[in-house]
């Protein structure tokens, strides 16, 4: 073996080589000595590129590539993604095979596989073909998951911001927990995103103008382009729509149960006819009817031959069948295609519950009916006659079969009819335009003409003018009638409002006096008015400050508002102060006398209550007879405590 030179020539190590060859090699070395470093770099890069090309040709796929692989159970092409073997879970390592790639299939994340590169096919190149191979919900959901994952890579490629988009975590039994989904090669994503390199907005505009999408992948790529465009503009993301997904394995059962309910309720399944000529369907129904009638006749003959006695009703029914058998068959054979269609529809209608009820009621129709008119002549009427509908088939009898509910509905219907009759007899009836000798449209045209043209009486004849005048007078008398009850109620309401206003006017006001400690001042008059306005209306003219702003008077219009302000001020001072503040409420002369009388009455009652308490304590002491027990001590403590509480609560 020889040493490899930068030019690619090989030097032999044998001692018996010719001197001429050595000289030639030395000449070559001298010619390229100056550019040896540059050539060496080119050779190294070429070797590395050859190594990469060799690996790509040998393998054909990289980690992160989307592929189609055959599922082991169904032998069907399934979407998946290649992962690094270092990320394989313990379950996947048990079935690991040398020289094969780890593929995690999309879907519910329950299956994976170690696949030979020859068993895989690229995802994008075969998407249109393989995505339409099955219509099962499980396969379609797997394809949607794969397309959604590709869309995330597309948006990440367009946004170029790692902080904005976070890579998702792989969820598969063959992959370790917490492993991030590998990135796809930029060459694949760029070929998918950009038809014309560097043009994104024009691509979106073109798709918006054509509004044509070849497959699901194209829709996802467009959606991700628009989302990336909004992200670059600093706007919100696109709205996400999640389709309603059924539980795998239960969607067919749910569909069958719904269909079963439809069949039970409305005879849905029996109404599905076979596609074909109407004549063929009619012939099959005729054949079935003939066979059923012949079988009935044969069974009746066998019963007669065996000596079984038949009732009169059965004999009549058999006789009717024998007489009408031939005629009925001939008439059915002579009927046209439309009659066959009607018969098939009748048979289908009998499948419904309402038709079965009608079948129980004997409402058969004969083809020919004899009727007598008033003169006694018999009239032969051919064709279908009108059936007399039973009242028991009306909705009020069909919906609720309870006797009580039926009586209630009948009574409500009768009462509604009575109300309608009473309403029709009242004077508020509609205007009869026919009596005026014109239709509503003509009257409307005449009224419009009279409203638009001031010279209406000159343009039209006297009859039309009279009609308009009569209609307007009727309309005014019809529309301007007042309800006497409403007119009578109006003065009462007005009187109540006036009484309330007088009460508020006659209600005496009250004055709140505020006094602060020595050496301190109160807030200004405006500040006090703003503070106490929240309790009610104030009389600003009667409100004033005195004693060098150490005292003030706030006049309230209503006594109730003043009392509320007084009580709130006693609880907590409504303005900031550093000294003690006293509040006093004074009523006017008339109100003060009433207030004083009430206070005196209250004081008298409180004194009487104290006397009763003292008498009770004295009675306990008299009953003790000079001996004090524990029970007596407890009673005296309770009574004295109650007495002291009453004394503390007394207002001086």
Swiss-Prot record:
The listed locations are: Nucleus
Positions of short motif Nuclear localization signal:
272-279
Q: Does the keyword Transcription regulation apply?
A: yes
What CDD domains does the record tag this protein with? PWWP
Q: Where is the composition biased (Basic and acidic residues)?
A: 329-348
Please name the InterPro entries in this protein's record: PDP_family_Arabidopsis (IPR052657), PWWP_dom (IPR000313)
Please state the protein's primary subcellular location: nucleus
Function description: May influence gene expression by regulating the function of the PRC2 complex and modulating H3K27me3 level.
User: Family per UniProt?
Assistant: Belongs to the PDP family.
Origin superkingdom: Eukaryota
Domain PWWP, residue spans:
63-126
The encoding gene: PDP6
Gene3D superfamilies associated with the record = 2.30.30.140
- A GO cellular-component term linked to this record: ESC/E(Z) complex
For biological process, the GO terms are: regulation of DNA-templated transcription
Spans annotated as Disordered = 1-24, 302-348
| Listed name of the protein | PWWP domain-containing protein 6
Q: Which UniProt keywords apply?
A: Nucleus, Transcription, Transcription regulation
């Amino acid at each position: 073996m020889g040493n490899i030179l930068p030019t690619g020539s090989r030097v032999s190590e044998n001692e018996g080589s010719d001197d001429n060859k050595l000289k030639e090699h030395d000449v070559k070395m001298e010619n390229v000595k100056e550019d040896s470093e540059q050539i060496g770099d080119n050779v190294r890069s070429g070797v590395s590129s050859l190594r990469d090309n060799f690996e790509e040709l040998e393998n054909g796929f990289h980690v992160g590539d989307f592929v189609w692989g055959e599922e082991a159970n169904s032998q069907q092409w399934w979407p998946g993604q290649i992962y690094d073997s270092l990320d394989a879970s313990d379950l996947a390592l048990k079935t690991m095979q040398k020289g094969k790639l780890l593929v995690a299939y999309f879907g519910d994340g329950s299956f994976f596989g170690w696949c030979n590169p020859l068993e895989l096919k690229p995802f994008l190149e075969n998407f249109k073909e393989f995505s339409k191979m099955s219509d099962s919900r499980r396969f379609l959901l797997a394809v949607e998951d794969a397309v959604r994952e590709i869309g995330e890579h597309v948006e990440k490629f367009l946004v170029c911001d790692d902080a904005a988009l976070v890579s998702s975590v792989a969820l598969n039994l063959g992959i370790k927990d917490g492993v991030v989904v590998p990135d796809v090669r930029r060459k694949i994503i760029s070929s998918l995103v950009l038809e014309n390199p560097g043009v994104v907005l024009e691509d979106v505009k073109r798709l918006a103008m054509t509004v044509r999408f070849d497959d699901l992948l194209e829709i996802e790529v467009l959606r991700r382009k628009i989302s990336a465009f909004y992200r670059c503009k600093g706007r919100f993301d696109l709205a996400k729509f999640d389709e309603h997904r059924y539980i795998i394995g239960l969607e067919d059962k749910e569909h069958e149960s719904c269909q079963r309910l439809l069949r039970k309720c409305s005879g849905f399944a029996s109404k599905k006819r076979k596609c074909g000529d109407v004549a063929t369907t009619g012939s099959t129904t005729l054949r079935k009817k003939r066979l059923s009638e012949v079988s009935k006749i044969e069974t009746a003959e066998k019963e007669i031959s065996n000596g079984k006695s038949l009732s009169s009703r059965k004999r009549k029914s058999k006789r009717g069948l024998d007489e009408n058998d031939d005629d009925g068959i001939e008439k059915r054979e002579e009927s046209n295609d439309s009659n066959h269609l009607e018969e098939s529809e009748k048979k289908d209608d009998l499948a419904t519950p309402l038709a079965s009820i009608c079948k129980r009621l004997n409402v058969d129709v004969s083809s020919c009916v004899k009727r007598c008119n008033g003169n006694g002549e018999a009239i032969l009427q051919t064709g279908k006659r009108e059936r007399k509908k039973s009242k028991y088939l009306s909705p009020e009898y069909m919906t609720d079969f309870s006797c009580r509910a039926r009586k209630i509905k009948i009574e409500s219907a009768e009462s509604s009819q009575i109300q309608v009759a009473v309403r029709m007899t009242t004077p508020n009836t509609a205007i009869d335009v026919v009596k005026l000798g014109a239709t509503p449209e003509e009257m409307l045209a005449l009224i419009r003409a009279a409203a638009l043209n001031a010279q209406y009486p000159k343009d039209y004849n006297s009859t039309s003018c009279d009609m308009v005048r009569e209609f307007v007078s009727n309309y005014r008398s019809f529309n301007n009638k007042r309800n006497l009850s409403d007119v009578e109620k109006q003065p009462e309401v007005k009187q109540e409002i006036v009484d309330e206003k007088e009460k508020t006017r006659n209600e005496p006001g009250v004055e709140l006096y505020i006094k602060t400690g020595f050496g301190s001042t109160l807030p200004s008059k405006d500040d006090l008015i703003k503070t106490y306005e929240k309790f009610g209306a104030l009389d600003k003219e009667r409100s004033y400050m005195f004693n060098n702003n150490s005292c003030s008077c706030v006049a309230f219009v209503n006594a109730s508002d003043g009392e509320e302000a007084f009580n709130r001020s006693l609880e907590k001072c409504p303005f900031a102060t550093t000294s003690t503040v006293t509040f006093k409420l004074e009523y006017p002369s008339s109100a003060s006398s009433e207030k004083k009388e009430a206070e005196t009455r209250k004081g008298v009652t409180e004194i009487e209550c104290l006397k009763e308490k003292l008498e009770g304590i004295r009675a306990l002491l008299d009953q003790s007879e000079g001996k004090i027990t524990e029970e007596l001590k407890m009673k005296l403590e309770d009574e004295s405590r109650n007495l002291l509480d009453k004394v503390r609560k007394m207002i001086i």
